[in-house]
Amino acid sequence: AVFNEEITSVDFTQRPFRLGAGSGKSYTAGSIIAATGAQARWLGMPSEQKFIGKGVSGCATCDGFFFRGKEVCVVGGGDSAAEDALFLTKFASRVYLVHRRDALRATFRLVEKLRTNPKVEIIFEHTPEEITGEAKVTGINLKNVKTGAVRRLETPGVFIAIGHTPAT
């Protein structure tokens, strides 16, 4: 059987295992598969939270097709960000990859794919300052980490790709 319920306790000292659920129910099982999942890690900006589902996404494969023919921005510098940026080139007319450092942390193979893709522009040494818009995202303000200068990108889509937090 499969239960979609929060398990709050497990007693592994006896068989069958005893599980306690948040609802107060208890279960027994001969074996257990823990599939806790993970959630996208967010930047923590108020404007980011305001626009989740309205142009801000933590899942390029889920939401990329909404931005067919449009310019989008991916925030991050690791493998997840590189993979998201490359995936988004299937839909977007241009993909800006924004990273706070002067080099990406992604693997060499992914970095080479990014550098040779004409749809990708990497913006180094910038951090998101504010995501702007009214009902939906219209752009993102990026701050240069060395000079403090602010640059604006007009875009309806901002993908946050800075990792995931395990749901444990």
Enumerate the predicted regions with their spans.
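A Rossmann-like FAD-binding core segment of flavoenzymes
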Residues: 2-21, 26-29, 90-168
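Portal/gating segments that form or line small-molecule/metal binding sites
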Residues: 32
